[in-house]
A protein has these predicted regions:
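Conserved short submotifs of the Hanks-type protein kinase catalytic core
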Residues: 61-74, 78
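Activation-segment/catalytic-loop signature of the eukaryotic protein kinase fold
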Residues: 56
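Activation segment signature within eukaryotic-like protein kinase domains
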Residues: 93-94
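A conserved short helix/loop substructure at the end of the activation segment
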Residues: 228-240
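Conserved N-lobe beta3->alphaC-helix segment of eukaryotic protein kinase catalytic domains
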Residues: 22-45
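Glycine-rich ATP phosphate-binding loop
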Residues: 5-26
Length: 246
């Protein structure tokens, strides 16, 4: 983001290419806790659908995070290229995201910022697997109750906006929003004005508009409806979502 840049580097011995996130310490001032949190989370996890941290090192001016190189670009870019996904392709993407999120939740980690920009394709291939990135806002449950409002407006769950104590369910809400976008090309909640947007989200008011949703299966709509539940207790968890027929 604003205090880092990512470069491709090559291991001198093995010739393997990696991504190196170069963080300028001076620009990081006041945001150290965010970075420390991201590193702590990444060190704890190992899953094929999550970007992996290989090592860290620092100089007097910079900090370097060596990560697996993914070259397929953001899910967001492919959505913009395609307009929408077929149900088969969309369900394959969402299945991988859910597998990764289930793993995170089992590890006691809530991502809190799932969105198409943070979902990357491992390679440019059509059938490339998806990996989750950007753990800057993620939180380990052992760090105490979650009540901080954070995330990206269009993907935030109602309970987060109402400043209630919240948990893993916020990630499932975000998966619901992403699923919706994959199938029709636009978000379920939208307003130029953030206050109006938040009102829509808090009421969980959205439609499967005609004609955009006319050819989408009832199964897909049912899947999304179980994720975009206003009450987090009624919302699907990862296991339930993965068992859904869609």
């Amino acid at each position: 983001g604003s205090f880092s840049e990512v470069r491709v580097a090559q291991h001198r011995c093995t010739q393997r290419l990696v991504a190196v996130k170069c963080i300028h310490k001076r620009a990081l001032k006041g945001k150290e806790a965010l970075l420390e949190n991201e590193i702590a989370v990444l060190r704890k996890i190992d899953h094929e659908n999550i970007v992996s941290l290989e090592e860290t090192f620092e100089t007097t001016t910079n900090l370097y995070l060596v990560m697996t190189l993914v070259t397929g670009g953001e899910l967001l870019d492919r959505i913009l290229e395609r307009g929408t996904y077929t149900e088969k392709d969309a369900s394959r993407v969402i299945q991988q995201v859910l597998e990764a999120v289930r793993y995170l939740h089992q590890m006691g980690i809530v991502h809190r910022d799932l969105k198409p920009e943070n979902l990357l394709y491992e390679s440019p291939l059509e059938d490339s697997k998806i990996v989750i990135s950007d753990f800057g806002l993620s939180k380990m449950e052992e760090q105490g109750a979650l009540s901080t409002a954070c995330g990206t407006p269009a993907y935030v769950a109602p309970e987060l906006l109402q400043q209630k104590i919240y948990g893993k369910e916020v990630d499932l809400w975000a998966v619901g929003v992403i699923s919706y976008i994959l199938l029709c090309g636009y978000p379920p909640f939208y307003d130029e004005n953030d206050t109006q947007l938040y009102k829509q989200i808090v009421k969980a008011e959205y439609e499967f508009d005609s004609p955009y949703w006319d050819d989408i299966s009832d199964s897909a709509k049912d899947f999304i409806s179980h994720l975009l539940q206003k009450d987090p207790a009624e919302r699907y968890n990862c296991d339930e979502a993965l068992l859904h027929s869609w």
